[in-house]
Amino acid sequence: MIKQLVLAASLAGLAAIATPAAATGKMTCSAPQAKWKSRTALEARLKKQGWQVRKSKVDGGCYEVYGTDPKGNRVEAYFHPVTFEKLLVSRRGQILYRKK
């Protein structure tokens, strides 16, 4: 009986930890790397739009940006590397924007 309670509590804890990651999902972009624009160009464009970029990197073939959006939200955002189209913006596991 005690083993079942411990197992149930452990599984509930794991589910709670995994929820934020599942909420945003994994973004993937499939564009030939030869057509990509530079990350510095994306950062410059975002800064002109009022973003504060702390860090950017490539993740899943997309550009992933960590920073503050123009509304002051500290966010993680994904952009298409060729078009710079905004694909997903999330804050602490909560989706603020997702391209349809």
Model-found features: residue ranges?
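Bacterial N-terminal signal peptides that target proteins for export
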Residues: 1-9
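Bacterial N-terminal signal peptides
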Residues: 8-16
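N-terminal signal peptide c-region/cleavage motif recognized by signal peptidases
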Residues: 18-20
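Boundary of Sec targeting at the N-terminus
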Residues: 22-24
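Short, non-transmembrane alpha-helical segments in secretory-pathway proteins
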Residues: 27-53
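Surface-exposed patches in mature extracellular/periplasmic domains of secreted proteins
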Residues: 51-58, 63
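Conserved histidines in hydrophobic membrane contexts and catalytic metal-binding motifs
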Residues: 65-68, 79, 84
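A short, surface-exposed interaction/processing loop segment used at functional sites
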Residues: 84-100
